[in-house]
């Protein structure tokens, strides 16, 4: 069930309707601020269909808070907690709290392992924001309705900071058609295009600013009143506005929610996950929303 804007006003203080000073760390060694969801070990040939067993009977998703195969764990590096997502099973780790109007920072580094069905695909994960409802409503039957700040190695038209609609989400992005890769690309001076309709559900980041393999890449998400900015190592790579979701032919606001980190067939590490409230989108980024 989606939360209304009125309901958001009643959320705990970590929804940031009440301004707070400083940054709040979201990661500790016990994952005390997070829950987990696992769906399936997806196989080659998956095209959105219900997974079945050897007898053709529908498989039940693993579900919430099972953490089968220890997909989600915390390791300590130099005395600091680091979240490891093995990628073996599709799913997510998501915040217990609902957040609205914030600046989120975190660092990401790739591991070595890859899993079916993405053995020959780019390493992939993602930050899903404004996440509402139950997990499992998307194409991969693994995540909540949300907007995606893609976390991907730079390869085959994918990059850190790309945008995906998850499930029936929608947003407007200034974009042009990238003829080289036959997709949309964030271009601040271009007209606004609505994502989530007419087959448009993906937009490339404007450029690649990922750190060399094996090094940490700093990601930042500014998310205020339906506007969002994706930054990679301090560079703006995408901006989206009018965040919403489509239901019964109508577009509805999608401006707050939980934060999900994806398990998507690749080993990945996250650290220094911090969040702080924003009363408004910082003026330095207003030029992206004219």
Feature names for model-found ranges:
Residues 1-3:
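Bacterial N-terminal signal peptides that target proteins for export
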Residues 5-20:
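Bacterial Sec-dependent signal peptides at the C-terminal "C-region" and cleavage site
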Residues 16-290:
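Carbohydrate-interacting regions of secretory-pathway proteins
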């Amino acid at each position: 069930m989606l939360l209304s804007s009125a309901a958001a006003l009643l959320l705990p203080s970590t929804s940031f309707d009440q301004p707070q000073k400083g940054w709040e760390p979201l990661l500790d060694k016990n994952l005390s601020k997070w829950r987990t969801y696992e769906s399936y070990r997806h196989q080659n040939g998956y095209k959105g269909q219900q997974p079945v067993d050897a007898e053709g009977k529908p498989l039940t998703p693993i579900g919430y808070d099972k953490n089968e195969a220890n997909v989600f764990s915390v390791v300590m590096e130099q005395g600091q907690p680091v979240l490891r997502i093995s990628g073996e099973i599709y799913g997510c780790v998501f915040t217990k709290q609902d957040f609205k109007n914030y600046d989120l920072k975190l660092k990401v580094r790739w591991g070595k392992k890859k899993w079916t069905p993405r053995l020959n695909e780019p390493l992939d994960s993602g930050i899903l924001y404004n996440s509402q409802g139950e997990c499992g409503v998307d194409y991969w039957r693994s995540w909540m309705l949300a907007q995606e700040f893609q976390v991907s190695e730079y390869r085959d038209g994918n990059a850190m900071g790309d945008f995906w609609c998850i499930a029936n989400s929608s947003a407007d992005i200034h974009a042009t058609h990238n003829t080289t890769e036959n997709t949309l690309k964030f271009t601040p001076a271009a007209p606004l295009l609505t994502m989530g309709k007419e087959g448009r559900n993906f937009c490339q980041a404007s450029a690649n600013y990922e750190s060399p393999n094996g090094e940490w890449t700093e990601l930042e998400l500014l998310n205020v009143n339906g506007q969002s900015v994706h930054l990679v190592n301090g560079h703006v790579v995408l901006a989206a506005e009018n965040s919403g979701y489509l239901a019964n032919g109508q577009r509805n606001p999608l401006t707050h929610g939980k934060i999900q980190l994806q398990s998507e067939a690749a080993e990945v590490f996250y650290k220094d996950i911090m969040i702080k409230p924003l009363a408004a989108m910082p003026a330095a980024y207003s030029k992206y929303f004219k």
